Amino acid sequence: NIHFGVREHAMAAICNGISLHGGLLPYCATFFVFSDYLKPAVRLSALMNQGVIYVLTHDSIGVGEDGPTHEPIEHLAMFRSTPNVSMYRPCDAKETAYAWISALKNRKTPSCLALTRQKLTNLEETSAESLKGGYVLKDFGKDFEMIIIASGSEVGLAYKVCEKLLEENICTRLVSM
């Protein structure tokens, strides 16, 4: 265990070096909002085909105790659009476990796991299908009138919305992406 302090770029660059040396599987963690500082090193691990794992915490659309300066708004789009980076934003413990296993097996590209600090409901319907990038979590009713797409901590919220809509006889399909 290496304590890097407040040095996100150095942390990610050192993990690249550990990966390049071989024999170890490096992973590191920081708040998702601070991923701006480690982005150049993540890009290099993608270019060098290094399987470093980046755990990015405190992901949420909600304002937490640290205030709006700690809301990762544009960061998900940044990593999703970076070539050769596997980006995971799991909605519960099962999807997190599948993402972690996939990241451990993926030794050719960096993996980023965006994890929330919020308490999440474990949904019975979640599955390894999340590794495809998106899947139908549940159909609420038979002939759905709309599709609701959500990812990460917002899937639980979308699930509750679908239940409420079904009470109003509006059938929906929920996709976890």
What do the predicted segments below correspond to?
Residues N1-A114, K119:
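Thiamine diphosphate
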Residues I73-L76, S81-N84, K94-E168, R173-V175:
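Glycine-/acidic-rich phosphate or pyrophosphate-binding loops and their flanking alpha/beta elements
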